[in-house]
Amino acid sequence: MEKNTASEDAFALSEATARDYLVLLKPRVMSLVVFTGLVGLVLAPGHMNPVLAVISILCIAVGAGASGALNMWYDADIDAVMKRTRKRPIPAGIIAPNQVLAFGLTLSAFSVMTLGLMVNWLAAALLAFTIFFYAVIYTMWLKRSTPQNIVIGGAAGAFPPMIGWAAATGEITWDSLVLFMIIFLWTPPHFWALSLFTTNDYEAARIPMMPNVKGELSTRRQALFYAVLMAPVGVLPWVMGFAGMFYGVVSTLLGLAFVYYAWRLWAADSQPQMLAAARKLFRFSLLYLAGIFAVLLFEALTFKLLAAFGVF
């Protein structure tokens, strides 16, 4: 991919606002990352200093934003082609690519060093690896080279609860790995459902998403496969004892519903039915992840508050 050099300075940088820089951070993605990171931090055993907890979450947020900025820098050519991304700051001519690169690298270094110096270096190392994985492994390599880009690249979005857990405990445990696996297995059906009704956009940008390379039927079959894998993994926090019965019931019901929506997508026998089913699965996938992590957070906060008041 060709990169602009001196000509980048011709951009109208003076017109860039704080909102434009906020867009570079991908705030919607950042909010999900912060939420799952917070759940990992609160769910972890023990008590963490509130100030250090806030610093940890802020560092996770800044690191996630840095990843988004680096992604927009490298993918500026793709963003200019796709309808849903062509108004981003670089293709819109608001911020120069070299400015975005500097912004992303600065935020990356700041978030990692702050987390390491103020909290612990294990959490900082996980954050650094997450930024590297998303910006380099996924964005620069996998995204443009294989239809399995989402499967492997999904690891980047699955690390935040592990980072939160490591910030609170200084450890990587099986419990935190389960949180990682839930998001990791959730990612393929979520994004493949999206790609099924945005196929033309990905085709125009020459991104080898599963529907464009392997076809719609294969994509639908694999979405169902990952949904079936994910559903029982989603129940593991209860099975392993670091979530309560309420979570067990909610995660089971939501997991079964997820499999049902994925099955409806696989079984669709016409294009209109397939597109409708893909949209429903995509929307429900958001509800699923938000739902189970919200219950985890609710239970963890409830148990810790009760313990603080000596109830048990």
Swiss-Prot record:
Pathway: Porphyrin-containing compound metabolism; heme O biosynthesis; heme O from protoheme: step 1/1. The keyword Transmembrane applies. It comes from the Bacteria. Its main location: membrane. It is found in: Cell inner membrane. It catalyses: heme b + (2E,6E)-farnesyl diphosphate + H2O = Fe(II)-heme o + diphosphate. One of its GO terms (cellular component) is plasma membrane. Keywords: Cell inner membrane, Cell membrane, Heme biosynthesis, Membrane, Transferase, Transmembrane, Transmembrane helix. It holds the Pfam family UbiA. Its EC number is 2.5.1.141. It is a multi-pass membrane protein. The chain crosses the membrane at residues 29-49, 50-70, 90-110, 117-137, 150-170, 177-197, 223-243, 246-266, 292-312. The keyword Transmembrane helix applies. Coiled coil: none annotated. GO terms for molecular function: protoheme IX farnesyltransferase activity. GO terms for biological process: heme O biosynthetic process. PROSITE patterns: UBIA. Disulfide bonds: none annotated. Carbon 2 of the heme B porphyrin ring is defined according to the Fischer nomenclature. Belongs to the UbiA prenyltransferase family. Protoheme IX farnesyltransferase subfamily. Converts heme B (protoheme IX) to heme O by substitution of the vinyl group on carbon 2 of heme B porphyrin ring with a hydroxyethyl farnesyl side group. HAMAP family: CyoE_CtaB (MF_00154). This is Protoheme IX farnesyltransferase. The lineage of its organism: Bacteria, Pseudomonadati, Pseudomonadota, Alphaproteobacteria, Hyphomicrobiales. The gene is ctaB.
